[in-house]
Design a protein with these regions (language model features):
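Short coil/turn linkers that connect adjacent helices within long alpha-helical scaffolds
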Residues: 6-7, 29-32, 53, 73-79, ...
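Amphipathic alpha-helical segments of tetratricopeptide repeats
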Residues: 20-28, 64-73, 112-120
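Alpha-helical adaptor scaffolds
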Residues: 34, 45, 49, 53-82
């Protein structure tokens, strides 16, 4: 399913989701916690691709919930590299949620998850995974920076400029044509 995930074949992705759901029934969280957490992480990855393809926020939210559930089983103390992998998956799911909702708090949380994974990968010499996660973190932080750069900050002069209800009666066309509309003007016309 990895190639199909990259290509985004929705039918294959739906089959993969169903397979993961069936596997969760066989590998119970309490009887087979390690296998169950692997299934949950795989499910989260598939849900990310599918949710992004069909632009479904609820599917992406299920991806996040799958990661969080897996993180209750895999901890940094008991399975650090697997925990970091789930953190990376969580970061990706949160990144996509931010992309599809415009809620940049998800992007901040995404960066936190990537940083947590990167720390563990660094401590355990997992260079290849650290490289992947570092690229994810850079992309997440770039998106946050771009979003903050796009926020409009009014110039100083605009902060004191107030439009009021009485401004709708102002003759903007006359103003733009050079007529101030002010008959009591002290300015004399030069002929």
């Amino acid at each position: 399913y990895k190639i199909d995930m990259a290509e985004g074949d929705d039918d294959v992705l739906r089959e993969a989701i169903q397979s993961c759901q069936a596997a969760r029934q066989v590998f119970d969280k309490y009887a087979h916690p390690i296998r169950w957490s692997e299934i949950m992480n795989t499910l989260a990855q598939i849900l990310q691709v599918y949710g992004d393809n069909v632009r479904s926020v609820p599917v992406l939210q299920h991806s996040v919930r799958s990661c969080v559930a897996a993180l209750h089983v895999r901890t940094p103390d008991t399975a650090p590299l697997q925990w970091a992998a789930i953190q990376n998956t969580l970061g990706s799911a949160l990144f996509l949620l931010a992309k599809h909702t415009g809620e940049w708090e998800y992007m901040r949380q995404s960066s936190e998850a990537f940083r947590a994974a990167l720390t563990v990968y660094g401590e355990h010499g997992a260079g290849r995974m650290a490289t992947v996660t570092e690229r994810n973190l850079i992309r997440s932080e770039r998106q946050m920076k771009d979003a903050s750069d796009k926020q409009t900050v009014d110039p100083i002069w605009a902060q004191s400029f107030n439009i009021t209800d009485t401004d709708d009666v102002f003759d903007w066309d006359a103003f733009l044509d050079g007529d101030s509309g002010d008959d009591d003007s002290d300015v004399s016309q030069v002929a």
